[in-house]
Regions:
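Short secondary-structure boundary/capping segments
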Residues: 3-5, 30-31, 67, 81-83
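Hydrophobic hinge/microswitch elements
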Residues: 23-77
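Flexible hinge/capping segments at coil-to-helix
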Residues: 1-12
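A bilobed periplasmic-binding-protein/Venus flytrap-type ligand-binding module shared by bacterial periplasmic
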Residues: 89-99
Length: 126
């Protein structure tokens, strides 16, 4: 766990403005009263992971997107004291519309995936 002071001193490599990941990051740091100016922004998760591996800074990305590099020991994760980065996804559909068999299977697949592959708590920093 790193302190807020150490967190603020990091060189941040972030997703582009408008991405869901960036929006979560901006909201969390803003609510904590922290101002962060990224040293680099990219649309590519792979580019951000590679930049992190090469020591250019720390990135904030989805845990599922970094698993291969994490499992290979190329990167590690850290928690920032008092900050929690999380993001929820929702399947939405019109309440009065007929759901096809394919749509129902897709919804079931999504629910099963979350149940079969739950993520440990992770705040999104590495």
């Amino acid at each position: 766990v790193i302190s807020i002071e150490d967190f603020q001193r990091q060189r941040f490599l972030l997703r582009e403005k408008g991405s869901g990941t960036r929006e979560v990051f901006n909201r969390v740091v803003e609510q904590a009263g922290i101002h962060i100016t990224p040293v680099w922004e990219a649309m590519s998760t792979t580019a951000l992971v590679n930049a992190t591996i090469n020591g250019l800074g720390i990135a904030v990305l989805s845990h599922r997107m970094i698993l291969p590099a994490l499992q290979q020991g190329l990167i590690c994760t850290v928690k920032a004291e008092g900050l929690s980065f999380s993001r929820n996804f929702h399947i939405i559909y019109h309440k009065d519309k007929f759901l096809t068999a394919s749509a129902k299977k897709f919804i079931a697949l999504c629910k099963d995936y979350e149940n079969d592959y739950p993520l440990p708590f992770y705040n999104g920093l590495y």
